[in-house]
């Protein structure tokens, strides 16, 4: 055998050896990952996220697991958590109800998987994901999943094994955070609506939500498009496999549409485009679509802090409509006697008196937005600065929002300060300043600052970090509905 043949054989052997090693490692991970609960029990680390919004998942999972009576299981994201009165559905249908919606950043796939813990003959499963490309895809977030599993690691057994690799990769960071908090004697204890005790036993959010808190009545970072293009084909196949599984258990699957803020609809939305959207869903989802998307579009004053989250009045309107849809699907002709509340008028948003103009106010360019301003640019003087602070007021009006192109031309900018007045930041805002590496966040509440949960920092400097002036601010953001996905960029203050 000549030298060249020897080398080729050695290479071939090396490739086979590498391939075998990869297969062995993959098999090892599949075997070891289910052992994590045992390791955690041995170490006896306390639950870290049980008071957080994600901590609610274990209660939803166990309610479903323990409910053997005939039941209605509503599977989806946070629009289900914020949009259903389960007791009202029980009253009018005679079924037990499990609200099995929580958080878009977990993804719809994991909620479908976990719901398999206890679906039986005679049950009804209503599938109601948000109308968003992320929730209508195979999206899986290992970081938020670990936080949600924190209270009950037995849920690992119901997660698709294809996601084990992502979970394993995220495990060191999760354990590091848990150990760090344990050593310091600290815990994750957020304030506001996004915490576990905002839910009742059914899994509905019962935290008081009197009116729409969004500046201008809608979230400008989240335009809603009613089109078949928002559905991922792989997700549709997975969803239809799930529907087939539900039917195999002797249960019935229905599909409905989540509530949609009329003010947030894409400008091209029309009656015809809505009908075409319905036709697409009805043709591609292998179960009865029991709702008309047009009836899911509600006026803005029925919403709370998101274009998919309802306030208390909106919950009643949405639940009554869902019961009517169920009645039609079940062949019932009963008349409903549910009093529908009027949409509550929110108070005028002006900002407190202590918000003042300062030396920063003259460095930005503004456009009118919701009785105040949004920032759309920076002056030439401001573009030359390495540090900027977003003002609270300008010309006597509150500054509410930051648009995606506001920092275009700010190549010198390295540090930016944001205070409590800002209620929305559009994706692209941070990437417009390529050298920005430090954001000082001087606010404690995260729920009133809406951002895109997946793409906010796309294109931004990879070294960018968010610094907080208080531990409660850090906690509320790192566990916050809109901000939790960016927890790895957040720096806990040293106090």
Show which residues each predicted segment covers:
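Extended hydrophobic/aromatic segments used for targeting, binding, or gating
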Residues: 241-247, 253, 257-308
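Structural signature of tandem-repeat unit edges
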Residues: 363-372, 383-400, 410-424, 434-450, ...
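Secreted/periplasmic serine-hydrolase-like ester/acetyl group-modifying domain
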Residues: 142-249, 341-344
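Membrane/wall-proximal cationic-aromatic binding patches
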Residues: 32-95, 105-113
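Histidine-centered active-site loop/cap adjacent to the catalytic His
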Residues: 306-348
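N-terminal Lys/Arg-rich, disordered targeting/topogenic segments
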Residues: 1-21
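Membrane-embedded segments
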Residues: 75, 79-159
């Amino acid at each position: 055998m000549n030298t060249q043949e020897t080398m080729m054989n050695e290479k071939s052997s090396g490739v086979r050896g590498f391939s075998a090693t990869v297969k062995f490692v993959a098999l090892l991970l599949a075997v070891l990952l289910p052992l994590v609960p045992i390791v955690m029990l041995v170490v006896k680390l306390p639950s870290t996220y049980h008071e957080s919004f994600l901590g609610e998942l274990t209660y939803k999972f166990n309610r479903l697991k323990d409910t053997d009576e005939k039941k209605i299981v509503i599977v989806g994201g946070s629009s289900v958590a914020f949009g259903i009165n389960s007791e009202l559905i029980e009253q009018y249908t005679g079924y037990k109800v499990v609200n099995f919606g929580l958080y878009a950043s977990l993804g719809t796939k994991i909620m479908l998987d976990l719901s398999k813990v206890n679906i039986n003959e005679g049950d009804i499963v209503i599938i109601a994901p948000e109308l968003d490309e992320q929730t209508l895809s195979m999206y899986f977030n290992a970081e938020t999943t670990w936080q949600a599993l924190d209270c009950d690691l037995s849920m690992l057994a119901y997660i698709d094994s294809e996601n084990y690799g992502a979970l394993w990769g995220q495990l060191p960071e999760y354990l590091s955070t848990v150990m760090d908090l344990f050593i310091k004697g600290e815990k994750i204890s957020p304030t506001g609506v996004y915490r576990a005790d905002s839910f009742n036993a059914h899994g509905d959010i019962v935290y008081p939500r009197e009116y729409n808190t969004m500046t201008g009545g809608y979230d400008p970072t989240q335009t809603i498009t009613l089109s078949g293009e928002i559905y991922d084909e792989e997700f549709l196949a997975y969803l239809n496999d799930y529907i087939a599984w539900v039917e195999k258990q002797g249960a019935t699957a229905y599909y409905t549409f989540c509530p949609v803020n009329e003010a947030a609809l894409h400008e091209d939305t029309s009656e015809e485009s809505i009908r075409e959207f319905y036709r697409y869903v009805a043709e591609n989802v292998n179960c009865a679509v029991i709702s008309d998307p047009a009836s899911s579009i509600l006026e803005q004053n029925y919403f709370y802090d998101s274009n998919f989250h309802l306030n208390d009045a909106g919950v009643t309107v949405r639940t009554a409509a869902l019961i009517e849809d169920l009645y039609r699907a079940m062949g019932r002709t009963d008349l409903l006697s549910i009093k529908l509340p009027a949409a509550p008028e929110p108070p005028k948003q002006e900002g407190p008196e202590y918000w003042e103009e300062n030396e920063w106010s003259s460095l930005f360019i503004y456009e009118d937005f919701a009785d105040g301003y949004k920032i759309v640019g920076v002056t030439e003087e401001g573009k030359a600065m390495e540090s900027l602070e977003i003002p609270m007021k300008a010309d006597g009006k509150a500054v509410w929002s930051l648009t995606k192109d506001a920092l275009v031309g700010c190549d010198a900018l390295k540090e930016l300060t944001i205070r409590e007045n800002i209620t929305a930041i559009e994706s692209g805002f941070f990437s417009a300043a390529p050298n920005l590496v430090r954001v000082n966040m001087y606010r404690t509440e995260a729920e009133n600052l809406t951002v895109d949960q997946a793409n906010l920092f796309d294109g931004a400097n990879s070294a960018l970090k968010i610094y907080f002036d208080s531990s409660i601010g850090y906690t509320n953001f790192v566990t916050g509905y809109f901000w939790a996905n960016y927890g790895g960029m957040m720096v806990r203050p040293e106090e």
